[in-house]
Curated annotation (Swiss-Prot):
Pfam families in the record: TLD
Similarity annotation: Belongs to the OXR1 family.
Protein name: TLD domain-containing protein 2
Residue intervals of the TLDc domain: 54-215
Organism of provenance: Homo sapiens (Human)
A Gene Ontology biological process term: response to oxidative stress
InterPro entries, sorted: TLDc_dom
Coiled coil start-end: none
Length: 215
């Protein structure tokens, strides 16, 4: 009896074809998923400034923006007043603020290079008494950002006289005050914000001051 002989014919491997197809698809998917750097959207948390700040760096601007109320997010910053352009005068600051209604960021650098200031829920103006809301806060970069929010103990947010500007008060002390010449100022712990002294010393000299309208 003749032995049976079998002939094996190798058929194309479906597994290999499938794997080969999958590898090709993966390459196509990877190519399609590659991001286009030029099309990357701008970071929505970084506000747009009408001009460069002489006091705040880009990193400091970004850090501060996280502490603003939601109604301010996305609004550009407009430089309403700066001492290098408008001079050292509180009355000039008031004049530049006339007609403004939105919140304001007041930021300054003192003779020691310390950067600090305040966020006011409304424009800075002359007033017979204190005004503002609980959105108002004080801040300091020392060198890391520290923010001092409203404690709820009183409503002494902002008060503007002809010869001084005060923010936060209680027991005869002010969280931040500036004189009429915008040359000298002071900072003390106050009940409104339970803040630390914003500068290295309670009394300081102003080197540069900016007021930004955030609306």
């Amino acid at each position: 009896m003749r032995g049976l002989r079998w002939r094996y014919t190798r058929l194309p491997s479906q597994v290999e074809d499938t794997l080969s197809g999958e590898e090709g698809n993966e390459e196509e998917e990877e190519e399609e998923a590659a991001p286009d750097p030029a099309a990357a959207p701008e970071d929505p948390t970084v506000p747009q400034l009408t001009e460069a700040s002489q006091v705040l760096s880009a990193s400091e601007i970004r850090q501060l923006s996280f502490h603003f109320p939601p109604r301010v997010t996305g609004h550009p910053w407009s430089l309403v007043f700066c001492t290098s352009r408008d001079g050292f005068s509180l009355q000039s600051l008031y004049r530049r603020m006339e007609g403004c209604s939105g919140p304001v960021l007041l930021v300054l650098r003192d003779q020691d290079g310390q950067i600090f200031g305040a966020f006011s829920s409304s424009a800075i103006r002359l007033s017979k008494g204190f005004y503002g809301t609980g959105e108002t806060f004080l801040f300091s970069f020392s060198p890391q950002l520290k923010v001092f929010k409203w404690t709820g103990s009183n409503s002494f947010f902002v008060k503007g006289d002809l010869d001084s500007l005060m923010m936060g008060s209680g027991s005869g002390r002010f969280g931040l005050w500036l004189d009429g010449d915008l040359f000298r100022g002071g900072s003390s712990p106050c009940p409104t914000f339970n803040n630390e002294v914003l500068a290295r010393q309670e009394q300081f000299c102003i080197q540069e001051l900016e007021a930004w309208l955030l609306s």
